[in-house]
Amino acid sequence: MIKSIDLPNIKNITVSGRIGSGATTVAMGLSKTLEWPLLEGGALFEKIHQELNISEVNVNGRPDKFDLEFEENIKKILREQSRQIIQSHLAGFDAQNIPGIFKILVVCEDSDGNDKPEIRIDRLVNRRKISIEEAKVEVLVRENENIEKWQRLYANGDKNWFYWDKNYYDLVINTYSHNQEETLKIALEAIGYK
């Protein structure tokens, strides 16, 4: 039986990031290295969309109750389980005020802190083998619809609220200036993995 790695003072790890930022890649690397199970939010939402027979891009076709239940389930897992890697857009936001959670935000920004959507689109094209136009819809349209919905559901309609606010996180990694191996190394060093 494989024994997972114990990290003092860290019960669970969340990994959040915008579409195509590299959050899933970081989460998968952490899961493999630490031998902790990975809960991937995107895969769960994809399943919900399939069950509802709606496009993943059709954020508003997904009833609010699915978002609310999903985020409550994430919070429950973070409170009640241990040695989990939770990767979802709102996982770090959900983890606020829950002790023992190490929250990672993965961004793709230039040196001035500006998001690089063209890089995220390119990554999506390569990872999912979809067209540039499909990737643009994912990154530009679906992301904006998610934000509008989540601002309404979780921030009382505050248009200045974004889950990628760096103040919510213990570690911010910029994949614009680091490759996959460097990014994983930064995360592992930050959590105290030797």
Could you say what each language-model-derived stretch is?
Residues K3-I10:
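Phosphate-binding P-loop
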Residues I13-S31:
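Glycine-rich phosphate-binding P-loop
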Residues K32-L39:
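Post-Walker A helix-loop "phosphate-sensing" segment adjacent to the P-loop in P-loop NTPases
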Residues L39-P99, N114-E118, D122, I130, ...:
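ATP-dependent small-molecule kinase phosphotransfer cores
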Residues D67-E71, Q180-L188:
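Short, amphipathic alpha-helical "lid/cap" segments that border enzyme active or binding sites
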Residues I98-F102, N167-Y169:
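Short glycine-/polar-rich loops that comprise or flank the Walker A/P-loop
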Residues I130-T183:
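Small-molecule kinase domains that catalyze NTP-dependent phosphoryl transfer to phosphate-bearing small molecules
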